């Protein structure tokens, strides 16, 4: 079977109504990562997800990026067939401000939001992110 094209993937996923699987917090809409993962597995069970990171001071590869000020971003990529999309997010507090030296729980929560947002780059729930890039 032929690998799906970006247009085919977008055509399938962008038509799915995610509205019953979102939650509003602090002025932003969040899509349930577990529900989003289930949809992706229903349609593309062979998708690949990877985390990018950097070497720490001991030479160990970490799946986060730590900036000189102590803030952290997570970066992931999702590949379906030959189509890859990437997304990144800073680890933030409830005010949507980057956290200095975040704990493992904050990093884990951000990773789940990051891959869910990466799914939006394929079409799943893309419309819930409209306007988040507009300055306040």
Could you say what each language-model-derived stretch is?
Residues 1-38, 135:
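N-terminal, Lys/Arg- and Ser/Thr-rich interaction peptides
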């Amino acid at each position: 079977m032929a690998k799906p094209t970006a247009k085919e993937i977008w055509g399938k996923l962008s038509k799915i109504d995610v509205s019953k699987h979102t939650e509003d917090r602090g002025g932003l809409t969040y899509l349930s990562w577990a529900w989003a993962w289930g949809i992706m597995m229903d349609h593309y069970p062979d998708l690949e997800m990877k985390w990018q990171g950097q070497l720490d001071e001991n030479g160990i590869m970490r799946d986060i990026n730590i900036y000189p000020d102590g803030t952290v971003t997570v970066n992931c990529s999702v590949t379906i067939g030959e189509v890859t999309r990437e997304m990144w997010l800073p680890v933030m507090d409830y005010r949507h401000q980057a956290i200095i030296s975040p704990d493992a729980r904050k990093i884990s929560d951000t990773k789940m939001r990051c891959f869910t947002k990466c799914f939006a780059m394929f079409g799943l729930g893309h419309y819930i992110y409209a306007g988040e890039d507009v300055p306040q």
